Swiss-Prot record:
This is Glycerol-3-phosphate dehydrogenase [NAD(P)+]. It is found in: Cytoplasm. Keywords: Cytoplasm, Lipid biosynthesis, Lipid metabolism, NAD, NADP, Nucleotide-binding, Oxidoreductase, Phospholipid biosynthesis, Phospholipid metabolism. NADPH binds at F10, R29, K87, A119, R234, E255. It comes from Cereibacter sphaeroides (strain ATCC 17023 / DSM 158 / JCM 6121 / CCUG 31486 / LMG 2827 / NBRC 12203 / NCIMB 8253 / ATH 2.4.1.) (Rhodobacter sphaeroides). It catalyses: sn-glycerol 3-phosphate + NAD(+) = dihydroxyacetone phosphate + NADH + H(+); sn-glycerol 3-phosphate + NADP(+) = dihydroxyacetone phosphate + NADPH + H(+). Sn-glycerol 3-phosphate binds at K87, G115, S117, K170, D223, S233, R234, N235. The gene is gpsA. The lineage of its organism: Bacteria, Pseudomonadati, Pseudomonadota, Alphaproteobacteria, Rhodobacterales.
Amino acid sequence: MIGILGAGAFGTALAVTLGREQPVTLWARGGTPRLAVDLPEQVQLTADFGEALAGTVLLAVPMQALGGLLRAEAARLQGRALVACCKGVDLATGLGPTGLIAEACPGSPAAILTGPSFAADIARGLPTALTLATQDEAAGEALQRQLSTAALRLYRTTDTVGAELGGALKNVIAIAAGVVIGAGLGQSARAALMTRGYAEMQRLALALGARPETLAGLSGLGDLVLTCTSDQSRNFRYGQALGAGAAFDGSVTVEGRATARAVVDLAVRHGIDMPIAAMVDALVEGRVTLPQAIQSLLSRPLKQE
C-alpha cells in the first residue's frame, strides 16, 4: 500500500492515478482533497495521520511545511521509504527535500518525485513522465516499479542534487517568464528569459555538484519549458499578475516566491551570478519596481554567450 500525506492538487492527483492500480491512503488534514475529482475505489481518504503511514509514503505538502512535518513525525516516519513531492529550498536550513528527509529520518530511503507535470493532467490519466531521484539505488528501483502506472512513466537517477535544484530553480524563472508576458513584453523576450534563466540554473546546480545531464532532463529543462509556457502553472500566473500590476489569490501556494530568496542566498554564498533570480527576489519583496527590474537586466554589460 502507498500512503500520501497531503491532499493538495498534486497529492490528490497522485492518489487518483496510483489508486487506479493499487491501494492508496490519502491523508487530508481537513478531510477534503483540494482537487475536485472522483477518487478511485482503492483510494481511502482519511483525516487520521497514522492511517496513511504505509511502507512507502509520498510527502505531498508545501516545501516550506516539509521540514516541520518531518521533525514532528520523525518517530512514526522512520524506516519507511519517503518520497518528497514538492519543489524548492527550505528557507530555514537551505536544504532540499531529500536533505530534510535525511536529517529528520536517517533510517529512511530519501527520494524526490519531480518533473514536468500538472496535477489536472495526472488526475485525468494523460501521459506524463517524471524523474524519481534517490541515492539509494535498490530503493530507487523498487519505487520506480511501485509508482509507475500505465500513464505515469518514471525515469530514475541518483543525482538528487540536480533533480531537486532543477525543480526549485525553474519556479523562480517561471515567475520571471510570467512577468514578461503580464507586462506585454512579447514572446521573443520570454524565449530570451527562459534561455538565460536556464543558464543560471546550470551555473548554480553544477557548482553544487549536480550532473549536467540531469539539468538537461525532465527535472530541469523539461520542467522549465512546461512551467514557463502555461498559465496552469501557479508560479507563471503569479508572475503574470506581477507584470500586469494585478492582484493574485493569496491562498494559492507559489513555491517560487520563497525559493527566490533561498536561491539568491545560495548564489551569493557560492559566488554564482544569477541576475534573473536576484531580480525576481527583489521584485517579489518590493525592493524594486517592474520598470527598474527590466532596466537593470537590459543594462547589464554585453558579454559572450
